[in-house]
A protein has these predicted regions:
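N-terminal phosphate-binding or glycine-rich loops at protein starts, especially the Walker A/P-loop
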Residues: 1
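Glycine-biased, small-residue-rich flexible motifs in mid-sequence functional cores and linkers
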Residues: 5-318
Length: 318
């Protein structure tokens, strides 16, 4: 990698230097092995303290890897998570673009300084990240060159900032393994998308799964993982889905049961208490509750989560 391949560019946006110990410094970065003394940021510093998912993968990505990066980043972004990645070619770029398309914030951690754009062809992408309420970040001074060792070092920041890291595609050998190791060291979850056993581009991800990474085999397993790690994420209305198509819409906001389920997932004990207060006179509260939950489930507006609680449906993309 040649430092001359980096573009000395000017990204437009507010510049900040976030010192360790300041209120803007993300607490999660203190979990990494060597927290940086300061972060150089162009864009919105507040995004660094948002709930986020880190998405990483191969630079020389296959169509499968690019598609997985887009799909799962879109699903996560639609549920209120910022998307964190490394701004590299391939899977990283797809993850950033998916977040931007969803109207969500995204963070790009660069290996070099924020005024030494690498790769140069991603200058427009980095500007879009900033314009969309995200941030371009480095632990290096503004004009520090993008030398190889700095990229491996920045992987610990990508892995530590989020509660989970998703590996969408990785071969062997792969720098993605250092990101996975850093995530585990920081107490973050590691998720991985399996690929064909005959694909060299998936050998790394498959190896991570064999070593204990959580396999993401479809939308449902991904959404279950998000719920397990982040709790109840917000319900979204996708294009083509009318805002009034659900019993959890505003037309029923006055219903105490619906309002309670919108606020947080609830177990049967709390639901039974609500039923005692809300069931019409003369009706058995337990029977009334079971009928209401069954109706809401049938209409696709409430679901039972893996831990047995009920809450709003987390909708997959269609």
């Amino acid at each position: 990698m040649s430092a001359t391949a980096a573009q000395t560019a000017v990204l437009s946006g507010p510049k900040s230097v976030v010192e360790r110990g300041s209120e803007d410094y993300p607490e999660r970065l203190l979990r990494c092995g060597s927290p940086p003394d300061r972060l150089y940021v162009i864009g919105n510093v507040e995004v660094l303290r948002m709930p986020s998912l880190s998405v990483v993968g191969a630079r020389k990505a296959t169509p499968y890897g690019r598609g997985c990066a887009r799909r799962f980043s879109t699903l996560a972004a639609a549920r209120g998570l910022a998307i964190v990645s490394g701004g590299a070619r391939g899977c990283d770029s797809e993850a950033h673009r998916a977040a931007i398309a969803e109207g969500a914030a995204t963070v790009a951690f660069l290996g070099g300084g924020c005024d030494r754009i690498y790769p140069a062809e991603n200058a427009a992408l980095f500007q879009s990240i900033i314009d969309g309420g995200g941030a371009v970040v480095s632990e290096r001074d503004w004009t520090f060159p993008p030398v190889p060792y700095a990229f491996r070092a920045r992987n610990r920041l990508i892995a530590s900032l989020s509660a989970a890291t998703l590996i969408v595609e990785a071969g062997l050998p792969s720098g993605t393994f250092s990101t996975a190791d850093e995530a585990l060291a920081a107490g973050s979850e590691v998720l991985a998308v399996p690929g064909s056993i005959t694909s060299a581009s998936s050998r790394g991800a498959n190896r991570l799964i064999s070593q204990g990474a959580e396999p993401i085999i479809d939308d449902d397993t991904f959404l279950d993982a998000l719920f397990s790690i982040y709790g109840c994420l917000r319900q979204e209305t996708y294009p083509g889905k009318g805002a009034g198509n659900g019993a959890l819409a505003s037309s029923q906001a006055a219903d105490p049961l619906v309002a309670a389920l919108r606020a947080e997932p609830l177990g049967m004990e709390k639901l039974r208490d609500i039923a005692q207060e809300c069931a019409p006179a003369g009706e058995d509260p337990w029977v009334w509750l079971m009928l209401r939950l069954a109706k809401l489930e049938q209409e696709g507006e409430v679901q039972r989560y893996p831990d047995g609680r009920f809450g709003p449906v987390v909708r997959p993309l269609v």
